[in-house]
Amino acid sequence: MAGPRRKSPGITPDILLRAYSIGLFPMAESADDPEIFWVEPELRGVLPLDNFHISKSLAKRVRRRPFEIRFDHDFEQVIAACAEETSGRPSTWINQTIRSLYATLFEIGHAHTVEAWDGDELVGGLYGVSLGSAFFGESMFSRRTDASKICLVHLVERLREKGFTLLDTQFTTEHLKTFGAIDVPKAEYALLLAVAMESPHLKF
């Protein structure tokens, strides 16, 4: 990963979108640190939309529709859940600066959620940023078995349907690799990003 570059809390939503367009994304050291820094990995996580695959057991569970899937229904609740410290995630990079910035992106149509609901309870979800024909996945959470996985399946279906060309996962994890995520060298990623940025901003 390239060295972090410190940025003041005075960052604006416009600057944030510009950063995405040139391959940068923000993180914070912790939820209590008001500053953010820019990250530009040497290897970028990408989930090819034409090579997305799921296990037979997950496909069967998706068909059973265990949750109601909603898009862009409750952004604040989703990002708050993603920022929660849990036993499996004792710290978070989502600070208040990031939460405020992405709430504004949501208001202007550049941040989106996929949400899994069980009745009136939010049990899983993810959020990310859309720009051109790219979707930049930011974070996800799950309070029920497979809830975030099912949200990811619906995200990919949505992106394919709308004509998106790039699903950026920032980094790869063993979990994401089971869906087909790959590490893409920075130079190759720049080419994929350039194509996506040449596209008009697609409606999510």
From Swiss-Prot:
Subcellular location: Cytoplasm
Catalytic activity: N-terminal L-lysyl-[protein] + L-leucyl-tRNA(Leu) = N-terminal L-leucyl-L-lysyl-[protein] + tRNA(Leu) + H(+); N-terminal L-arginyl-[protein] + L-leucyl-tRNA(Leu) = N-terminal L-leucyl-L-arginyl-[protein] + tRNA(Leu) + H(+); L-phenylalanyl-tRNA(Phe) + an N-terminal L-alpha-aminoacyl-[protein] = an N-terminal L-phenylalanyl-L-alpha-aminoacyl-[protein] + tRNA(Phe)
Keyword check for NADP: no
GO BP, one annotated term: protein catabolic process
NCBIfam families listed in its UniProt record: aat
Principal subcellular localisation of the protein: cytoplasm
Entry function: Functions in the N-end rule pathway of protein degradation where it conjugates Leu, Phe and, less efficiently, Met from aminoacyl-tRNAs to the N-termini of proteins containing an N-terminal arginine or lysine.
Record-level Gene Ontology MF annotations: leucyl-tRNA--protein transferase activity
N-terminal signal peptide: none
Keywords: Acyltransferase, Cytoplasm, Transferase
Record PANTHER family: LEUCYL/PHENYLALANYL-TRNA--PROTEIN TRANSFERASE, LEUCYL_PHENYLALANYL-TRNA--PROTEIN TRANSFERASE
Top EC class for this record: transferase
Family that this chain belongs to: Belongs to the L/F-transferase family.
Source organism, top-level taxon: Bacteria
Gene3D superfamilies reported for this sequence: Leucyl/phenylalanyl-tRNA-protein transferase, C-terminal domain
Pfam families linked to this entry: Leu_Phe_trans (PF03588)
Protein name, entry field: Leucyl/phenylalanyl-tRNA--protein transferase
One GO cellular component term noted in the UniProt record for this chain: cytoplasm
EC number of this enzyme: 2.3.2.6
